[in-house]
Amino acid sequence: MIDRYKHQQLRIGSVSPQQISAWAKKILPNGETVGEVTKPYTFHYKTNKPEKDGLFCERIFGPIKSGICACGNYRVIGNQKEGPKFCEQCGVEFVDSRIRRYQMGYIRLACPVTHVWYLKRLPSYIANLLDKPLKELEGLVYCDFSFARPIAKKPTFLRLRGSFEYEIQSWKYSIPLFFTTQGFDTFRSREISTGAGAIREQLADLDLRILIDYSVVEWKELGEEGLTGNEWEDRKIGRRKDFLVRRMELAKHFIRTNIEPEWMVLCLLPVLPPELRPIIQIDGGKLMSSDINELYRRVIYRNNTLTDLLTTSRSTPGELVMCQEKLVQEAVDTLLDNGIRGQPMRDGHNKVYKSFSDVIEGKEGRFRETLLGRRVDYSGRSVIVVGPSLSLHRCGLPREIAIELFQTFVIRGLIRQHLAPNIGVAESKIREKGPIVWEILQEVMRGHPVLLNRAPTLHRLGIQAFQPILVEGRAICLHPLVCKGFNADFDGDQMAVPFSLEMQAEARLLMFSHMNLFSPAIGDPISILTQDMLIGLYVLTSGNRRGICANRYNPWNLKSYQNQRFDNNNYKSTREPFFFFLIHVMRLELMGRKESIQIVLCDSGGNQSNALLLQEKLPSKFTMNLRVPIMRFMDIIQQQEVQKKKFFVYTFEPLLVIFLFTEKSKKLYKGFFGPTHMIPNHMVSKLKNSMTPI
């Protein structure tokens, strides 16, 4: 169990089989050693007690009730005069039941099994160290390939050693048929190597320091060759150099952490404490079990079957032994990471089992949900909103959060100013929230920075310090320029406000937001405009635009009065709401011979107008609603050869004028939409002169 007062950090890595055994083994007073889980059972269906040597065994993992063994005997915990520490009949230790939260067990595997994280995860650590393709290693692990052992002085079984290379698979269908289980095991251990045992042997033979030296020499040789001029060859050399760098870094990491490469192949499989994979009884007597229990049972079943084939059965073909080894490997893979090799394992309801990887990774995993996401004293949490009027180093703190964070300081201030005789009276004054409380709170907040933390904290700028100020409401106000460091936006993100004395000293020196203007990873500016600010600037600076980008404060729009309409009844200028306008529809019929015409749509001021000219009427959902969101309409100047055609004009302008200019007659025809409005002659001539005959 990790002592929180002695250990301030956590490291995850590979461990030796001896360490796994030391975690679980216990020696009873009679000399018996317990810790190995050998049976796939959980609870007895009649007595409802854990099965001996099963996944919930009290001898291995500790008693279910503190101080009570499986027989029902009771001992006072920690009392040496009561008698022995273990029950002489059932072998259960008289300890606190909380031991079942951290006491582990182990499964002794009948064959070595590779850890799927080191084999299948990219980049594959095993493939990097052995310098072999991942596909070949997978075939070796799952007994599809084999290779000949390097025997020099011993006599070989066959003269043709080449038939045992993993590229030639003829031996799989002929050799095992002539051996019993013991005979094939002897032959295989002497002549060939396959399965995870072959990987373990190769990893054990590695000398990491020599591997680093060889990699450095090869990298230098590739660098001295230079470019060949062949693009494909140059890429191949570049990939090889990158691989050598990764290989050297991995080997150095193994040396620094004192981890042996062969530990990536498991001989002992750790079993999690029972409290971390519980079985719970619900209403109606039904039991709910963690998925990991079912995956452990699958491993134990297959491992026991393989053990029986290797020890008790004498007539089992060697091929069946290899198939069972493959099943054990697949069962352990499913336990560690379900679905990493393809189709995941499912239960009877077609639901995917949650493996060990699923339990610890992700937002709802063990680390982020339970360890990193825990609440601490003197902290609060609320939604963030934009505060553009704030300074870069300030944040707006809601009154409810601030009074809770600084409550102890406010109590001290009330007592020092003789406004409250004791803590109880001071707390009652705080609950009343009088004006003096807010004055003392503001005085206290001037010298106390706070930390804002947004999960997930993936880099250093996920936590920054700010000088708080009181704001109304229940949301934390944040300057928009610091959002990129937090990877935050204002669509409901929540932030935590931790508070402690050590935090204040570190915050003043290192963590104020105005001291973290650049990214520590790449050095680029981190306090830059993002998301909402960029959209707002685009809208504010967009030119002569209609639709959703229209802005009444834009000088382009003010100049042309695009949002303005005239009421002919009282001749008063009015404006439509900013986001919604009226859409006017007009049916236009053109009569004439086959000739080209030019259609120009103008408003009452003679300016070219935005409108949509269609030969077919739009669906009713566009035309029946008088008020619809602003749509962007294009300027229509098009040629049509008409005899009698019908057009529909959609526009925002109630006083639209349609000018038709024909090529042959060189005449200008005009029509009106809306109330009759006379166009001055000089405007008509101006428009006629501006049009070029087609």
Curated annotation (Swiss-Prot):
GO cellular component: chloroplast; DNA-directed RNA polymerase complex; mitochondrion
Residues reported to bind Mg(2+): 489, 491, 493
Cofactor(s) needed for function: Mg(2+); Zn(2+)
Catalytic activity reported: RNA(n) + a ribonucleoside 5'-triphosphate = RNA(n+1) + diphosphate
EC code(s) of this entry: 2.7.7.6
GO MF term (any one): magnesium ion binding
Keyword Membrane belongs to the record: no
Chain sites annotated for binding Zn(2+): 69, 71, 87, 90
Keyword Cytoplasm tagged: no
Cofactor descriptive note: Binds 1 Mg(2+) ion per subunit.
GO aspect biological process, one term: DNA-templated transcription
Pfam families cross-referenced by the UniProt entry: RNA_pol_Rpb1_1 (PF04997), RNA_pol_Rpb1_2 (PF00623)
SMART domains: RPOLA_N (SM00663)
Function according to Swiss-Prot or TrEMBL: DNA-dependent RNA polymerase catalyzes the transcription of DNA into RNA using the four ribonucleoside triphosphates as substrates.
Subunit structure: In plastids the minimal PEP RNA polymerase catalytic core is composed of four subunits: alpha, beta, beta', and beta''. When a (nuclear-encoded) sigma factor is associated with the core the holoenzyme is formed, which can initiate transcription.
Family per similarity comment: Belongs to the RNA polymerase beta' chain family. RpoC1 subfamily.
Record-given protein name: DNA-directed RNA polymerase subunit beta'
